[in-house]
């Protein structure tokens, strides 16, 4: 899979996922520095894992706000945002955005998520932009690795799937 960052090819490390795959477990750090696991965030129907390079960039900011605000009232759907930002940066962003109740997880320590989902941009030690939708049995039903990391994912495809 060819992915670019600001027009330059990057190497993705880890195991690429596809629809039908079982979502691998992972551990990441929450804003209170607690180690958390995927099973803690599974929705009754679906879980959206929104992966961003850095919460402090415009596209990542929009992606995080858009998925959380749009899907907030969709029954049985949980949204989790994963980045390599430090938990303190995620907490600051959530407070400034007025979104203290959303779930953000930092993969900065062990890169466990990145290795399990194939999102590590080796050259930058950042996550590639991606979206994974899991059903309640942890089966991946939608995957998007965004070809150009500085671009937006296909929000409509995810929202259409979840609101059907």
Briefly describe each language-model feature range:
Residues 1-164:
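Chalcogenol-based redox active-site neighborhoods
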């Amino acid at each position: 899979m060819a992915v670019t960052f600001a027009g330059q090819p990057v190497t993705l490390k880890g195991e690429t996922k596809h629809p039908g795959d079982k979502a691998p477990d992972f551990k990441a750090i929450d804003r209170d520095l607690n180690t958390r696991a995927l099973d803690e965030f599974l929705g009754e129907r679906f879980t959206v894992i929104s992966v961003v390079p850095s919460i402090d960039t415009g596209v990542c900011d929009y992606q995080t706000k858009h998925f959380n605000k749009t899907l907030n009232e969709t029954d049985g759907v949980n949204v989790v945002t994963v980045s390599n930002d430090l938990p303190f940066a995620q907490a600051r962003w959530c407070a400034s955005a007025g979104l203290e109740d959303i779930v953000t997880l930092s993969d900065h320590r062990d890169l466990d998520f990145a290795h399990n989902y194939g999102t590590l941009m080796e050259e930058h030690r950042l996550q590639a932009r991606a979206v994974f939708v899991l059903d309640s049995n942890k089966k991946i039903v939608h995957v998007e690795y965004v070809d150009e990391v500085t671009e937006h994912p296909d929000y409509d495809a995810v929202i259409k799937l979840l609101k059907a």
